[in-house]
Each structure stands twice: as structure tokens, then as C-alpha cells.
């Protein structure tokens, strides 16, 4: 199963550099406590690393078990 990342904006990017604000925007986060689900890709991991002080990340499994 492909992994997904649950990303939540927990701190406002106001007062931080423009590139960190842009990274938050490109992750799809607009409001505080907003949650987005993204694929677990190296590009997304790099974006998260850049704004790790502003977001909360949780790994989730895609889909359910059909057993």
C-alpha cells in the first residue's frame, strides 16, 4: 500500500520568510489547523522539512484491509 502524509498547519507563517510562507501555500495549507493529505514523496518530505516548525505530520496507510 502506498503511504500518505497527513499534514496539519499548527503555527502561523506570519513573521517568517517569504519562502517559508510560499512553501506552506504550496503544500495546500491556508488556515490554521487545516489538514491536507499528500503522497509520501521526497519532494513533499523536503517541503515539510523546510517548515517543520509550523506543521505537524503523521504517516497514514492508504486504503483499508479487504481480508
Swiss-Prot record:
GO molecular function annotations of the record: structural constituent of ribosome
Record-linked InterPro entries: Ribo_uL30_ferredoxin-like_sf, Ribosomal_uL30_bac-type, Ribosomal_uL30_CS, Ribosomal_uL30_ferredoxin-like
GO cellular component entries: cytosolic large ribosomal subunit
Alphabetical keyword list: Ribonucleoprotein, Ribosomal protein
Record keyword Ribosomal protein present: yes
BP term (GO), one: translation
PROSITE patterns: RIBOSOMAL_L30
Assembly and binders: Part of the 50S ribosomal subunit.
Protein family according to the UniProt entry: Belongs to the universal ribosomal protein uL30 family.
Protein name (database record): Large ribosomal subunit protein uL30
Organism (species): Thermotoga maritima (strain ATCC 43589 / DSM 3109 / JCM 10099 / NBRC 100826 / MSB8)
